[in-house]
Regions:
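Conserved FAD-binding catalytic core of PHBH/FMO-like flavoproteins
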Residues: 115, 131-132, 137-243
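Short phosphate-binding/catalytic loops that engage adenosine nucleotides
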Residues: 28, 66, 122
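Active-site-adjacent segment of FAD-dependent monooxygenases/related oxidoreductases
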Residues: 42-116
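Glycine-rich FAD pyrophosphate-binding loop
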Residues: 24-46
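N-terminal Rossmann-like FAD-binding beta1-loop-alpha1 element of flavoenzymes
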Residues: 5-32
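A conserved beta-strand/loop element that lines the FAD pocket in flavoprotein oxidoreductases
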Residues: 118-130
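A structural signal for isolated positions on well-ordered beta-strands in alpha/beta enzyme cores
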Residues: 8, 31, 123, 230-232
């Protein structure tokens, strides 16, 4: 076992929370910072595409004893259901009998992971904006605005898990010989919803990932625990049949 360290994780998303649990279980003091409010106390309006959890993700959870906790809020998905037109549906199983992936609400999973991390002893600091990090000392700087007054917090290690507009990566990019590239696809998405039947049951097979492929655009649907389906329409930003 390593000597206990004081560690900061910037970002309370799925990666940040799981990393924090791993570090805490190894005996470290772990603080998680996030500029957003506590996701458990607000209506979730972030990225809403359902998350599909495969065997690799299950293993990552199993290694810290959390797989059953998380799978309890998911729906097993054993196959793709390809809706090619009319009433034709082609089924493609993901593996042998019993081999499945899991459909989970991203927001519900994130809330669960924060709960599990807190239960493990991780401390969270929500609404705290990290603007800078000293890459040599791991000291982080927090303040209300980028040009305002900052307070510093000293750590032995700081991990960046703060997403697409990461302040940690921003600081790393200013180092010599640091390569970074960013590309944008000409594909966007919109969330749609298939509500549950009046009795709360699913309108489609809940254990399938439903796909309606139509050339350069497609619709997919994954089941939720409440009987609904979260659907995602993928289309080009421009041109015919686009957003």
């Amino acid at each position: 076992m390593q000597n206990p360290k004081k560690i900061a994780v910037v970002g309370s998303g799925l990666v940040g929370t799981l990393l924090a649990i791993y570090l805490k279980k190894r005996g470290h003091t772990v603080h998680v910072y996030d500029r957003s409010p506590d996701i458990r106390k607000i209506n979730f309006t972030g990225r809403s595409i359902n998350l599909v959890l495969s065997d690799r993700g299950v293993k990552a959870l199993r290694d810290v004893g959390l797989d059953q906790e998380v799978l309890g809020i998911g729906i097993p998905v054993e196959k793709r259901a390809i809706h090619t037109g009319s009433d034709t549906v082609n089924e493609q199983f993901y593996g042998k009998d019993g081999e499945v992936i899991y459909s989970l609400s991203r927001g519900l999973l994130n809330k669960k992971m924060v709960d599990l991390a807190e239960k493990a002893g991780v401390e969270f600091f929500f609404g705290e904006k990290v603007w800078d990090v000293d890459l040599t000392t791991a000291t982080i700087s927090i303040g209300e605005s980028e040009r305002g007054e900052w307070t510093t917090h000293d750590y032995d290690l700081t991990f960046g898990a703060d997403g697409a507009f990461s302040r940690i990566r921003h600081k790393m990019q200013r180092q010599s010989m640091f390569n970074y590239s960013q590309e944008f696809l000409n594909i966007g998405y919109k969330e749609l919803n298939i509500p549950a039947n009046a009795d709360g049951s699913h309108k489609l097979d809940k254990n399938s990932l439903h796909i309606w492929p139509r050339g350069n655009f497609m619709l997919m649907a994954l089941a939720n625990l409440d009987g609904s389906f979260t659907c995602t329409l993928f289309m080009p930003h421009d041109g015919e049949n686009s957003f």
